[in-house]
A protein has these predicted regions:
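Conserved N-terminal glycine/acidic-rich loop preference
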Residues: 129-131, 152-188, 197-246
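Structural recognition of the beta-strand scaffold that forms the well-ordered cores
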Residues: 44-49, 53-54, 85-90, 127-132, ...
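Charged, often glycine-rich, active-site loop that binds/positions anionic groups
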Residues: 94-116, 258-273
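Serine-esterase "nucleophile elbow" of acetyl-processing enzymes
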Residues: 36-94, 148-154
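Short amphipathic alpha-helices and their capping/turn segments at secondary-structure boundaries
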Residues: 32-44, 80, 113-130, 135, ...
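Catalytic His-Asp segment of secreted/periplasmic serine-dependent ester chemistry enzymes
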Residues: 201-300
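Oxyanion-hole/transition-state-stabilizing segment in secreted/luminal serine hydrolases
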Residues: 56-58, 109-171, 203
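Secretory targeting and sorting signals
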Residues: 1-37
């Protein structure tokens, strides 16, 4: 997870990471969880993706600690629902290139080795693959980190990303589209019988935002969520074009964004109110994402 410089943001992450380490919940091994062992008759399920899928800082952590892979992320919750045999290789900071390249890992700027290419988990007999990717290719979390302000009269950061009439975020999203297509084609090549499920990203902030609770101006709240929505559209289009099934997580997330009460939120804001990374799903969110994916699988 790339951390912003917002003091409250960094302090909250360091506190949670320290608590996990002290209680022994942060396991710094590179092993695939024991649940990955193939069982006779069980659906063979591989989970690929970035921190939205890995569930950083949601206890308990399994695998490389810098990947932030939670035993309560949507993959683990879904595998439990399906009775599937899971290989979860999701990892915070992963981009599309890390499907076929190893990923250098660090936490709070401390090097922590590397994670193997995520595609190493795929097998010819894999039955189900889930994928959540794109946020790091397009840098959307980094953009959100740079849009915070406690000054209601500040210049909207939206202007910075549209200087000279150039839609910088739109360019990044457009550049990501063919990369996703290649990833999906490669999954089919490696696991030709697998059902491939691709999720979009959720609803992070409601229209107009909730400044100063979440310290982004109303126009920037709409700019940020609008960028997520545009990327979701690209993910849906590429999924349809490359034989994958798209799961919309944003629409069902209405009323569960970072502006809501702690018990209602599926995603955390800049300073979390639950054990989860800033600007990422909490356990409630991961469980609901698993329910949405499970309902899709069982209904079609």
């Amino acid at each position: 997870v790339n951390l912003p410089q917002h003091k409250g943001f960094c302090r909250s992450v360091r506190t949670i990471v320290g608590a996990l380490a002290l209680t022994g919940l942060a396991v710094g091994t590179g092993a695939v969880p024991a649940s990955a062992a193939t069982e006779d008759g069980a659906t063979s399920y591989v989970a690929l993706g970035d921190s939205m899928a890995s569930g950083p800082l949601i206890p308990d952590i399994t695998g490389p600690v810098a990947c932030g892979r939670s035993t309560h992320n949507y993959a683990h919750e879904l595998a439990s629902r399906l009775g599937a045999s899971l290989r979860d290789v999701t990892c915070s900071g992963a981009a599309s290139k890390h499907m076929t390249e190893k990923q250098s890992l660090s936490l709070l700027d401390i090097p922590m080795g590397s994670a193997p290419p995520q595609f190493d988990a795929l097998r010819p007999d894999t039955d189900l693959v889930t994928l959540t990717i794109g946020g790091n290719d397009t840098g959307l979390v980094g953009i959100a980190q740079k849009c915070t302000t406690l000054d209601p009269n500040a210049t909207p950061c939206k202007e910075k990303y549209n200087e000279g009439g150039v839609d910088q975020v739109g360019q990044r999203i457009a550049e990501f589209a063919p990369k996703l297509g290649v990833v999906l084609d490669s999954i089919h090549q490696r696991s030709p019988h697998a059902r491939v499920i691709v999720t979009g990203y959720g609803l992070y902030i409601k229209p107009g935002g909730c400044w100063p609770l979440q310290p982004v101006l109303p126009v920037d709240a709409d700019f940020l969520q609008g960028s997520v929505d545009r990327m979701n559209t690209v993910i849906a289009e590429q999924s349809a074009a490359h034989g994958a099934e798209y799961i919309d997580l944003a629409t069902p997330s209405k009323g569960h964004d970072s502006c809501q009460a702690p018990s209602d939120k599926w995603v955390e804001g800049y300073v979390p109110t639950a054990a989860a990374a800033p600007l990422h799903p909490n356990r409630n969110g991961e469980e609901n994402y698993a329910a949405l994916i499970g309902a899709h699988l069982q209904g079609s």
